[in-house]
């Protein structure tokens, strides 16, 4: 099943997210800050990221901006999971490239449903971006053909 990264400094919330995702069949990796996340992104890109805004050392919105600016991670689906609940905060997160926004406290069933829905949409889009015929693969996103 898909690997999901959780970027959350609150141990209790991270534990709830991890438990819910693992019980839904996902593999989970956890990070307390952006520096740890970026180190891991160098070697493995996840299927989805759950990202808090209020993190130590680096704001989640800055992390979001950096993820979207990197061609290797630009299309990774990101759900902001944060205590910032104002309409302005939500609009800012979505405008910077978040795919969804969940306010804390959140319902675990809603979180899992949003993860599933986002993965369903993005997985289909990724599959459509690659076309194969025999031993030929055309990657429309990379404008490349592989034999």
For each of these PLM feature ranges, what is it?
Residues 2-3, 117-147:
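Short, Lys/Arg-enriched segments at the junction into DNA-binding effector domains
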Residues 65-70, 75-132:
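Basic, amphipathic DNA-recognition helix from helix-turn-helix-like DNA-binding domains
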Residues 10-29, 39:
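Two-component/phosphorelay signaling modules centered on CheY-like receiver
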Residues 32, 55-58, 67, 88:
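Hydrophobic residue at a beta-alpha junction
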Residues 30-48:
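Acidic, metal-coordinating helix/loop segments flanking the phosphotransfer/catalytic sites
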Residues 7-8, 31, 49, 102:
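Conserved sequence signature across two-component system core domains
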Residues 9, 51-52, 81:
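Active-site T/S-Asp motif of two-component receiver
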């Amino acid at each position: 099943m898909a690997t999901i990264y959780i970027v959350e400094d609150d141990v209790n919330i991270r534990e709830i997210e991890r438990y819910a995702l693992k019980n839904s069949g996902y593999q989970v990796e956890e990070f307390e800050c952006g520096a740890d996340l970026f180190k891991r992104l160098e070697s493995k890109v996840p299927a989805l990221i759950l990202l808090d805004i209020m993190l130590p050392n680096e704001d989640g919105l800055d992390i979001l901006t950096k993820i979207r600016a990197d061609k290797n991670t630009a299309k990774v689906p990101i759900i902001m999971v944060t205590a910032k609940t104002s309409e302005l905060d939500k609009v800012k997160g979505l405008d910077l490239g978040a795919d969804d926004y969940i306010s804390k406290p959140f319902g675990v069933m809603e979180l899992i449903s949003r993860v599933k829905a986002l993965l369903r949409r993005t997985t289909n889009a990724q599959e459509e971006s690659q076309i194969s015929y025999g031993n030929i693969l055309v990657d429309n996103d990379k404008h490349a053909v592989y034999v």
